Amino acid sequence: MAIIQSSAYEPLTEQKATALAVRLGLFRDGTPLLCREIGDGNLNLVFHVVDQETKQGIIIKQALPYAKVVGESWPLTLKRAVIESNALRTFASYVPQYVPKVYYSDESLAITVMEDLSYLQIARKGLIEGKTYPLLSRHIGEFIAKTAFYTSDFGMNQQEKKKLAQSFVNPELCKITEDLVFTDPFFDHDSNNFEDELHLDVETLWNDDRLHLEAAKLKRKFLTEADVLLHGDLHTGSIFASDDETKVIDPEFAFYGPIGFDLGHFIANLLLNALSRPESERRPLFDHIDRTWAVFTSVFSELWRTESVETYAATPGLLDDVLRQTFIDAVGFAGCEVIRRTIGLAHVADLDGIEQKDERLAAKRHALRLGRRLIVERAELDGTEDFRRLFVETER
């Protein structure tokens, strides 16, 4: 790994990104390089540097000190770049096949240089196009199971876990989730964003005391339960995929939180894609939900039985209790994410990309009804087949 002297923060340009790649020695001397800024996210600059002869490339990602979606009036910590690079390295120690390689990071410049995954496609885009990604849910189920187990009190020494958790204290980005996922959509807040035609539907949510109580319970879990190292923002836009490969990216929201959170986020985004499809094309999404949970429980359970360091792990019923609570939490977190992505600050192309306005509004009303029931009825769901049942029951 190359080492260069850090300097004071300044935003990169394509020219500076190219110079950095050369200084790091990641390409042969004299290689003709092409650099393009490709970032389309809200929080970062992303540059793709490619050797024009071999077509081999790297990605240079730099955190911005503000959210692009809002501007400099919304300052953000640059520490999230360190969180991201450390999370990728931590995940790589357990599931290297599911994350990009990190070549270099610079804390003061808020830069991470990593493997080029441009030969893959962002899963959200592919799902919108109708791709099925047959191994996506198997890979994500394994990713979540292994990263959760090995960073939990069951998979690592408890004192070492506490030290690791300290290195992933991430208050600024957790605050974004606390507000945009668990709070703002349930109240009349300026950050919310929805069509005028949905106002009556949204007001119903704002005045729903039962929904508020259950959302508050889920927010409390997010705030207080430091179970495992989470990706923190595991939606289909944070995953590169092909028919046989899956890579998880962008863990700048990583922190120690409740086991079910990443599961719920991923499931929610599968549901959001299903909401955008006609009935005849939804089955692959529900199959993915089934497999995600099945693989997660299988892998997590096997690790529990064979590698747990917790004395109580052999106690009959404890694993079942952990898995049951994880499922209930995942259902509730999925409901919060579905509602947030429908009426909150950051929408998804799955719903917003529906061309016919009437169909788009119908899908969003469906999303609000589904999200509500996932939250308030989460403890009543017995398994992933109940996602199908609630989906159908809330369609009209």
Curated annotation (Swiss-Prot):
Gene3D superfamilies: 3.90.1200.10, Phosphorylase Kinase, domain 1 (3.30.200.20). GO terms for biological process: L-methionine salvage from methylthioadenosine. Keywords: Amino-acid biosynthesis, ATP-binding, Kinase, Methionine biosynthesis, Nucleotide-binding, Transferase. HAMAP family: Salvage_MtnK. Homodimer. Belongs to the methylthioribose kinase family. This is Methylthioribose kinase. The gene is mtnK.
